[in-house]
Every structure is written in C-alpha cells, then in structure tokens.
C-alpha cells in the first residue's frame, strides 16, 4: 500500500514575515514548556520533602516517572499524530500537561503527585514533543525554512535547560512550589489556546488503524531497557551490589536490559507484518532499513548522550566537590546554553553550504574537546577556568549536532513518514540520555569504588581492621566529604583512620571523574567515524 500522504506542500512558503514564523513561536513555547516541567521538579525537591513529607525514594520515583512514561510512549505518540492530526495531538498534549501541573500544585499527597501529576506529565510530553517535530515537518516544507525551524528548537532546548530551573527556583523562593506549578499550568493553558492558531496539516487520505499490540510491546521493551540501564549503578552490572537485589545470584540490571531488547526485536517483527497488512505502523520499515535515517537518530541520541554525561559528571562534581551554589551552577549552565544557542541558530543560516556529515563530525569533535577540558578542569576540591571551556564546547557541539539531526531524519523518508518520525526522534533522545547516564555513571562509581579500596589496601596510615572493613563495602558512591564521612561512620569502627580515608576518597573522586571525562572523549571520538558514515555529504539546509 502507498505510504505517502497529501500534506499541504506549500504551507511553509505561502506566508512571509511574522505570519510565516508565528506557528514556530508556538511550537518553541511548547518545547520550552516540556523542558521546564522536566527540569523544574529538581528545584522543588526540598519543598516536596518539607510540605508533602516525601522521602528521598519518593523524590527519585517522581523524577523517574516522567522520562519513563514519556520515553515508552513517544513512538505511539508519533502514530497518533497521523490518526488524530498533528494539531489535535499538540493540543491534547498541552491539555494533559496543564492538568498535570494543576494536580501537582494542589495535591497534598505525594503518591498523587507521583502517580497522577508526573504520569500525566509523561503522557502529555509523549504527545506534545512528537507533535512539535511533526508540525515543523508539515508546516515548513522548504528545506531552508525547515533547517531554521529545527535549529530554533535546538536553541530552545539549550535556553530552557538554564532558564527553566532559574524561573522555577525564583517562584519557589519568592512564593512557594505550588505557585511555580500553577504558573506552569497557566503556561500550558496558553499553549493549548495558541494551538488553535497553528497551521493546519492535512491528515493522510487513507484511514489508519492504531497498533495497540505494538504499543504494548514497544512500551514494555523500552521501559525494561531504560530501567535496566539506569539501575546498573545501584544493582551492579554482573555481581549484585545488594544482597536483596539479585536474580539467581547476579544483578537484575543486565537481564532486564536483555529482556527489553528481546521484546523490542519481537516488536520490530510485529511491526513489519502490521505495516504490510494495514499500510501504516508505529515503526515503518523505512525507519529500520534506511541507513541515513538511522544515523540521523544516532545524532538525535548523541546530543542527549553528551548532555546527560555532562550533567552527571560536570554538574555533580561542581555541586558535591567544588561546593557550587544554585547561582554558581546557573552561571556554568549559561555558558553551556550560550554556546548551544549560537551554533544551533548560526549553523543552518551561516553555514548552510557545509555538508551535514562534516557539520556533525565537527559538532562531535567539539564534544571531544569539551570532555578533555572537563578532565583538565577537574581539581581535588574545585574546578578551574578550563572547566568553563568544557561547558562552552559542550554547548557549541550539541548545538551543531542538534541543528542537523532532525533534518537528516526527515530528509531520508517520504513526507508522511517524516512527520511521524517525531516520536522515534524523541525516543532516541531519551535512550541517548539514558545510555550516557548509565555508562558514565557506572564508570564513575565502579572506578571510584575500586580506587578507594585499592588505595586503602596499600596505605600505611590505615589499620588492618579498617582495610578489611573498607573491602566489605559493596559500592562507594560519589559523595561530598560530609556525606562520605557519614558513610564511613556507619561502616568503619576505627575513628583515627577517618582523615586518611577522606583524603583517599578525595584523590579517588578526582581520578574517577577525570577517567569518566576521558571515557566520554573516547566514545565521542569513535562516534565521529562510526555513526556518521550514512549522513549526506552535502547540505540539507539550502533553500529547495
């Protein structure tokens, strides 16, 4: 069955000036809103603990709920856009997010906050984000206009990463966390209303059947993979880190990931048959068999892989070791956002003549430089000025890659599949970030644990009893001096050994962070040559 569709071919060229870009402004507002909802929660942690009696595990669960649901349902959101229409999908997503913020603002129960508010946020984002990407493809059919639009979305991601926590934090400090969530509810309400003014994109002329079985399979598979990867640092890779967390004597993390991959393989086989029978599916064969599209998805994931790794290594070190306050961290994030803003907007306009492949290779190269700068900027109890270069080059590199990634994906397939690709693009972002956090988090924790145990065992300043007790600690997380002292107070009986252990941890903490930066640099360097081979060696940003 023909899988093309009639999609207002000149919608993006019929208007000029403000009228031409008004829809993009609305879409950018939606993108910034989803980033604000996701990042704002971390700022509200203390308020939730104090006012709702939330525990640390409750906060962790609340933080995980949004990305888990959004990540599992994004692909389904991409197909719903074809069935409902992208404009309707956009407004349903905005409405769900508005309702989620209202519940978050007025509930007095942390369980309602987690399972109602955060779940609805995840579902809302799984509709809204694919709709934003799908509408850009449908509205801006000229390649130059589309490149500018995708570059603007990339810039919005960079700005929102810094602005959202600052605004959320200001509202919490000035009023309270409920006012902050009320403000988000009003914001998404405005986005919903503005959705009526979006350019209309015609739905496919052929009636499309929704794939319920595929939705269940992909949701289970992605959830298993994401949870398994994120739990490696808590459960262990092979050997269990806790006696209560094991399956037949091994960590459940890897079996869970393998189970998820097996389910996703079944999902792909199901999708092939479903598309043959019905003409459309969650994962069209063009997504699976088109090399250019696959590399485009790798680039979507690469941006968030680097972002996740940078936040995990860089921001964590600044706050726990260097003692950065919220305002100090904001300055670092502003440097990052400035870099991302510059390149995401300049690349499709000032460098439209440069090939996509070369731009992506340059962008990843900047990320390699950023990782080396992170390693060089890391000191025993602080970070130096080189560390700010890491933030800048991370932003510059991610901005270049993000400006090209969606273009590469949408240019690889027909118009209908291009609009549907928003869901799989968003999913690749989530998976990329998950891999970044999982891999670098594991390197950070396992190397730190091994270094502390090894240095303690070889130290002449520590008693034999203390060495044995250190060896018995399953894992040593990345902690501030204060928190590390509390850890050894629970596990080490010889108080005279505490100063030596704290010094050992400081050295190991620095070395493990530097090692993690170098692993990130190596992974990015390898990606330059392995993940860009099928990206077009010509520009996709020139006017069509």
What name fits each language-model region?
Residues 82-221:
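Helix-loop-helix hairpins in multi-pass membrane proteins, especially solute transporters
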Residues 31, 94, 100-101, 117-118, ...:
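A generic transmembrane-helix signature of 12-TM secondary carrier transporters
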Residues 173-298:
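Hydrophobic transmembrane-helix bundles of small-molecule transporters
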Residues 24-63, 69, 251-255, 275-416:
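Transmembrane core module of solute transporters
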Residues 48-49, 80-81, 167-175, 229, ...:
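Interfacial helix-cap and linker-helix signal at transmembrane-aqueous boundaries
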Residues 74-86, 172, 343-356:
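Helix-to-loop junctions at the C-terminal end of transmembrane segments
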Residues 387-473, 532:
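Small-residue-rich alpha-helical segments with characteristic i,i+4
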């Amino acid at each position: 069955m023909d899988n093309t569709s009639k999609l207002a071919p000149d919608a993006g060229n019929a208007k000029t000036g403000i009228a031409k870009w008004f829809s993009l402004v609305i879409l950018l507002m939606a993108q910034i809103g989803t980033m604000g909802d996701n990042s704002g929660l971390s700022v509200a942690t203390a308020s939730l603990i104090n006012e709702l009696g939330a525990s640390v595990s409750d906060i962790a669960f609340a933080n995980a709920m949004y990305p888990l649901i959004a990540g599992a349902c994004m692909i389904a959101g991409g197909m719903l856009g074809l069935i409902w229409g992208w404009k309707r999908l956009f407004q349903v997503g905005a409405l769900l997010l508005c309702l989620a913020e209202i519940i978050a603002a007025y509930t007095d129960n942390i369980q309602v906050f987690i399972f109602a508010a955060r779940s609805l946020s995840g579902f809302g984002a799984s509709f809204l984000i694919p709709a934003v990407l799908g509408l850009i493809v449908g509205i801006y059919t000229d390649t130059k206009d589309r490149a500018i639009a995708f570059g603007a979305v990339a810039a919005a991601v960079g700005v929102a990463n810094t602005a959202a926590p600052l605004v959320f934090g200001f509202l919490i400090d000035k009023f309270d966390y409920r006012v902050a969530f009320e403000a988000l509810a009003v914001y998404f309400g405005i986005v919903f209303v503005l959705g009526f003014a979006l350019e209309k994109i015609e739905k496919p002329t052929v009636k499309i059947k929704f794939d319920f079985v595929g939705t269940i399979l992909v949701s289970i598979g992605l959830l298993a993979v994401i949870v398994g990867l994120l739990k490696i640092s808590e459960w262990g890779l092979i050997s269990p880190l806790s006696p209560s967390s094991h399956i037949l004597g091994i960590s459940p993390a890897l079996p869970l990931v393998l189970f998820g991959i097996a389910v996703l393989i079944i999902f792909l086989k199901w999708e092939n048959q479903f598309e043959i029978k019905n003409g459309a599916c969650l994962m069209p064969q063009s997504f699976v068999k088109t090399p250019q599209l696959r590399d485009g998805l790798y680039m979507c994931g690469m941006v968030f892989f680097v972002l996740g790794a940078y936040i995990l290594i860089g921001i964590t070190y600044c706050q726990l070791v260097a003692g950065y306050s919220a305002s100090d961290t904001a300055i670092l994030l502003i440097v990052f956002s400035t870099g991302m803003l510059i390149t995401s907007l300049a690349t499709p306009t000032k460098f439209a003549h440069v090939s996509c492949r070369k731009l992506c290779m340059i962008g990843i190269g900047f990320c390699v430089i950023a990782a080396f700068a992170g390693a060089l900027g890391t000191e025993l109890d602080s970070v130096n000025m080189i560390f700010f270069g890491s933030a800048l080059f991370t932003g510059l590199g991610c901005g270049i890659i993000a400006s090209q990634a969606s273009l590469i994906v949408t240019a690889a397939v027909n118009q209908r599949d291009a609009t549907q690709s928003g869901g799989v693009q968003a999913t690749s972002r989530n998976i990329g970030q998950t891999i970044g956090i999982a891999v670098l988090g594991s390197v950070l924790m396992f190397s730190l644990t091994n270094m502390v145990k090894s240095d303690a065992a070889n130290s002449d300043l520590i008693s034999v009893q203390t060495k044995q007790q250190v060896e018995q600690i399953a894992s040593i997380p990345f902690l501030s001096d204060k928190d590390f002292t509390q850890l050894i107070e629970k596990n080490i009986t010889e108080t005279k050994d505490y100063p030596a252990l704290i010094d050992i941890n400081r050295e190991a903490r620095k070395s493990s962070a530097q090692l993690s930066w170098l692993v990130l640099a190596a992974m990015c360097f390898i990606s330059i040559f392995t993940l860009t081979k099928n990206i077009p060696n010509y520009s996709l940003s020139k006017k069509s």
